[in-house]
C-alpha cells in the first residue's frame, strides 16, 4: 500500500522551479533515500509531502497517515532549520513531538515523560534532558530531534539530513535504529 503518491508534482519559489514533474510512490514499508546536490530540491520535496509549500500536480496521502485530524508523520528537520535560541529543554523538544496528537493546550502525562526519557536514553543523551537545547552539541541536537520525530509513533518518518553533525559511531547507530524503526514505519531521508 502506498502512503504517499506524487504525480507530476512541481514546486516553484518566486518563479524558480525547485522541483519539476516529480512522480514518486512511498510504500508503507519503504526505506527511501533521496540524494542530490545542495540546492537540488531534496528539502523542497520533503516540504511538499508535509504540505508546507504549495505545489502543482497530484500529491495524495493515504488515509492510514491520519488519525482524525492528526497526521501520523514524524519529521526531523535539518538542524539549521531549528532555532537554537528558543528557550526549551532537550526533554521539552522531544515532548513537543506529541503536540500533533495532544494539541498545544494539553499537558504531558507521566507516561509521555517516561517515553521521552526512554527515547533520550536509547539515543545516549538522557543526561542532557534538562539542558537548554541551545547548549547541546550538534550531534546531541540531532539525537533529540530524532527522538522528537518518533515519539508519536508515526507511520511515515521523514528525516532531512539526519547524519549532519554526528560522529561516525552515532551515524552507524542511527542507521541501525532506522533499520529497526522501518519494521513498523516507512522512512524517507
Label for each model-derived stretch:
Residues 4, 18-19, 129:
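Conserved structural motif at the start of ABC-family nucleotide-binding domains
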Residues 54-73:
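Conserved ABC transporter NBD signature motif
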Residues 108, 132-136, 140:
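Conserved ABC ATPase signature
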Residues 109-128:
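Conserved ABC ATPase "signature" region
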Residues 146-147, 174:
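Hydrophobic anchor residue at the start of the ABC signature
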Residues 157-161:
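Catalytic Walker B motif of ABC-type/P-loop ATPase nucleotide-binding domains
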Residues 177-189:
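Conserved catalytic loops of ABC-family nucleotide-binding domains
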Amino acid at each position: 500500500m502506498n502512503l504517499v503518491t506524487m504525480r507530476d508534482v512541481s514546486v516553484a519559489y518566486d518563479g524558480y522551479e525547485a522541483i519539476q514533474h516529480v512522480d514518486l510512490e512511498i510504500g508503507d514499508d519503504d526505506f527511501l533515500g533521496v540524494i542530490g546536490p545542495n540546492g537540488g530540491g531534496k528539502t523542497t520535496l520533503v516540504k511538499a509531502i508535509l504540505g508546507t509549500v504549495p505545489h502543482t500536480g497530484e500529491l495524495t496521502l493515504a488515509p492510514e497517515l491520519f488519525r482524525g485530524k492528526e497526521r501520523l508523520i514524524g519529521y526531523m528537520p535539518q538542524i539549521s532549520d531549528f532555532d537554537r535560541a528558543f528557550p526549551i529543554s532537550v526533554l521539552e523538544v522531544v515532548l513537543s513531538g506529541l503536540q500533533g496528537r495532544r494539541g498545544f493546550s494539553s499537558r504531558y502525562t507521566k507516561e509521555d515523560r517516561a517515553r521521552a526519557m526512554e527515547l533520550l536514553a536509547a539515543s545516549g543523551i538522557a543526561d542532557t534532558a534538562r539542558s537548554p537545547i541551545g547548549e547541546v552539541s550538534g550531534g546531541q541536537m540531532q539525537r533529540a530531534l530524532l527522538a522528537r520525530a518518533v515519539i508519536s509513533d508515526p507511520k511515515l518518518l521523514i528525516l532531512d539530513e539526519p547524519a549532519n553533525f554526528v560522529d561516525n559511531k552515532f551515524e552507524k547507530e542511527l542507521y541501525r535504529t532506522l533499520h529497526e524503526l522501518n519494521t513498523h514505519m516507512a522512512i524517507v531521508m
